[in-house]
Amino acid sequence: MKKQSSRVALVVSSFIALQSFSMAQAADFHRDIIYQVFTDRFFNGRKDNDNPPQSPGLFDASRKNWKAYWGGDLAGVKEKLPYIKSLGCSAIWISPCIDNINKPENDAAGNMVAPYHGYHARDFMRVDEHFGDSDMSFKDFDALTKAAHDLDMRVFVDMPFNHTSPYNHAEYGALYDAGQFRSDVENDRNKYFHHLPAVSDFNDPYQLQYGTIFYLGDLDQENQYVDTYLKQAAAKFQSHGADGTRLDAAKHMNWGWQHVLANSLYNRADHLVLGEWWLTGIDDPMYKDAVKFANKGGISLYDFPLANAIRKAFAEGGDLTLVDQVVSQENKDFIDSNELLTFIDNHDMSRFPNIVKDKKVTQLALATLLTSRGIPIIYYGTEQGLYDDTKGGEDPYDRPMMQSFDQSADNYKLIQKLTALRQTNLALSSGKQRTLFCSKDLYVFERRAGADVAVVALSLKPKEALLDAAEVATSLGLVDNEVRQDALAGALSGIALEGAKQLSLPPQSLSIWLTNSNKSSAFIAAIRPPAATAGKAVTVYGKGFGTSGKLSLAGEALTTSSWADDKIVFNAPLLKHGRLVLEVEAANSSKAKSELVVVENKLVLVRFVVPDLKLAAGEQLYISGNTSALGAGSLLPNDMAGPMLVNQDSDEKPYMLAVPMPAGESVELKLAVYNAKGLVRAETKPHNLKMPQLGPSVITMTWQ
C-alpha cells in the first residue's frame, strides 16, 4: 500500500495554497438547528450555469424530467440565507457540490438521467459547474460560506467518499484530481477501487465496507493515494469555510478510516462530522455496530431509528411508545445522544405529508422533533408544506423544486416559534431527556439542563385526555397552585399548567412548560471535539460553571487555559486516553459529569491481518491493547477493536480489521476470542509493535 507514495505528493502539493483560508471556530453544535438544502431543487441564483459547456444537455428548463438538473445552485442558496435564518435555523446542510460526471446515465427506458443530486462524483477537489461556475472554482462556495458566517450561520458539506459514479456506463466510475484523470474502475492499475460483488448480506460488516452498492465505483480508502486524496478534499472544503462534513453512506465505507478522517479534521479546527448510517430501528442487526462506531470515533450519526419511529407513531393507527423506546435506549447506548442528528424526512425517503395527510398532525410531529434531544434537521420546503404525491413521493419525487418562500406560511410561523424557544432555552437545546409518561397516543417528557427544565406534553388523541400532573409539577418545581403558561401560547392547542391539578389535554395538542431557574448549577451541554487528540485543545460548553472551579478527567486534575460561566477550555492530557469521565466542579460546589474520548496521537489506518486461525461457530476475534482504539486496556468487546472480519476476497480467508492507530507510537496488544457467553481464550504473550508514521499500512500477526 506504500507503493503510491510518489503520487501522494501530487495531492499534498495542490493543497499548500489553501492555508490562507479561515476555518470555523469552536462551537456548541448542540444548539444548532439545521436546514437541509437539496441544492439543485432550491433556488436558481445564476442562469449562466444551467447548461454549462463541459456537460451540455443535462438541464431541463421545463422541469418535467425529475432526474435532470433544474437550475438550483450555490448562488441561489446564498441569496436565500436570510429566509433560512429568519426561520430560526443556524446551519445549512447542502447536498454534494463537488464535481460530478459530465455524461448522462440513461435509465432502462432510455430516459436521460443526470447527477443532479451530487452523489456521482468525478473530482472531489472541484465545485461542479452546475452549482458554481464553468471554471469549477470555489468562488461561489466561498461567497456562500462568507455570507453564512456573516449571519452567524454554519455550512455543512456532503461528501460521498464511499464511491464515484456507476462503473458500468457513462464515465465508468472515473476519478479525477483537480482536473487530472487518475483512473476508472475498468482500468484500475493502481487499485484505487474495490472489485468485489454487490452487497448481498446487509448484516455482514465485511460486505458492507468492501462490497459495491448501486453499481458504483467503490473507493478503497486503504489505498495510500485514495486515503490522502480524500482527506485533503475534506480539508480543502474545511479551509474554504465548511463547518461540518457529512459522510454519505458511512455504513458502507471503511469504518476505521472514517475515524482517521474525523481525527484529521478535528486536529485542524473544530468541526462537526456527521455520519449517514441507515438503520431500521434499535432492533436492527447493525445497531450495536453503529453505536460503537459513533462512540469510539466522535462521529454524530443520523438518528434513523428515531425518524422511523416518529413516522410510524404519527401515522394513522401509530403508537408513541415506539418513540419512547428509541429515545430511552439511545440515551443509554450513546455517549451523548444529544449529538444525534434528528429528522422526520429527507432526500432519501418520502416526505412526511406523503405518509401523514393531516396538517395538524404533521405540525405536532415537527414540534416533537424541535423539542426533543438531538440536533434537529428541517428538510427544505417543510416550512411551506412542500410535497409531491407521484408514486407515493418516493425518490425522485421527494425532491420537488422549491415553490415558495412565503414567510407567512403556517408551518413557517410555527417553526419560527419553536426554533426561537429552542435557541433561547438551554433545556430544549441541550437538556437531557426523560420520559414522564407515555402511552399509545400520549407522550410527556422532560428536558433538563441543570436547574433549567422544560416539559412537553403531546396528545394525539382525537378527544380530550386526562393527565395526572403531579410528576409534571414536581419536575418543573411548581409550588402549590403556581401556574405555567404554554410557551407556544396555544399555537398547537396547548394549555396552561396549574400546580399539580389534573390536566385535561385538548385533542391533538402539544403544550410546553418551562422553568428557567436563577439558581446556578453546573451543567455540561457539549464537549468539542468529542474525540480529542492528546495535547490538543478541548472546549466544554454548558452553564453554571462560574468564573473558576476544578476540572478533572478520569480522576486527574487538569489545568485550564480559560474558564467562564458557559465555557471551559483545556488541553487533552498526554498520558490518559480512551473513553474517560470528565467532571466539572464549580466554585459553588455544584458538579456535572460527561465523557470524552482521547486518542494518543494523530491517527493512521492500519490493517491487522491474522492468517491460519480457526474459530468455532459463534466465536469472534477481537484486538485488545493499550490504545484508545483497542480499548485502552479494557477486555470488553464494546471497548476493544473488532470483531475482526473474514476477508472473503482471499482464498485463505484470513481475519482482518482496519483500525485507527496512533502514528509512530509503540503499542502493546493481544488477540482475544469471544462467544455469546464471554471470553473463550486470549493470547498469553502480547505483541509489541511500532505503528507507522504514515498510513494506510498492513501488519500481519500470528496467535501467540
Where are the language model's segments positioned?
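Short proline/glycine-enriched turn/loop motifs at strand-loop junctions of beta-rich domains
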Residues: 462, 543-548, 615-619, 664
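Short edge beta-strand/loop segments characteristic of extracellular beta-sandwich folds
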Residues: 456-458, 537-543, 607-611, 622-624
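Beta-strand/beta-sandwich contexts
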Residues: 516-548, 578-579, 589-602
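Aromatic-rich carbohydrate-binding modules that target alpha-glucans
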Residues: 614-666, 674-694
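Substrate-binding/active-site clefts of carbohydrate-active enzymes
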Residues: 26-33, 38-240, 256-286, 301, ...
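Carbohydrate-interacting/catalytic domains
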Residues: 5-9, 13, 20-38, 50-55, ...
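Active-site-proximal helices and loops of the catalytic beta/alpha 8
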Residues: 143-153, 163, 232-336, 340, ...
